[in-house]
């Protein structure tokens, strides 16, 4: 199981992409908070009051080298474009976490031609590589696509669980309703009364 270090993209006055009354910076911070809640002690959230790109934060970062850095973003384009994918630094091979994350995000937010996209023109993947950190940037669908955005907002818990599972981080089972209408947790019935 990995320890996840989560950076929420944009912020500190930079709203990032916008769509349907939402900003990328606010949405990815909401997702980061959900990851923290569900992942517990296996997740550390980077200071969300910063813009880690603008202030060059990764270059002064001091975390254990075996922690996995995940930077959260949402894409923007014309409303018909959709889908999620993982970005890694050009010249590096995807590791098991990149692959698992890409498989999950492309099934949760389908639509992109490439699940994993190596890039050599982004600062934070390069900075993390220079510092020897394992890093990937996750595009959580398009904020400008109503389907992606509605799924992001309406199924954020499922999105967070899928991300955490890609890193081998177990999460609490969601509460479910038993056949007798009683709420159960973790698949264990709290009331064994059978109704006929």
Protein language model regions, located:
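Short, solvent-exposed mixed-charge patches
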Residues: 1, 195-196
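Surface-exposed patches in mature extracellular/periplasmic domains of secreted proteins
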Residues: 42-50, 111-119, 174-176
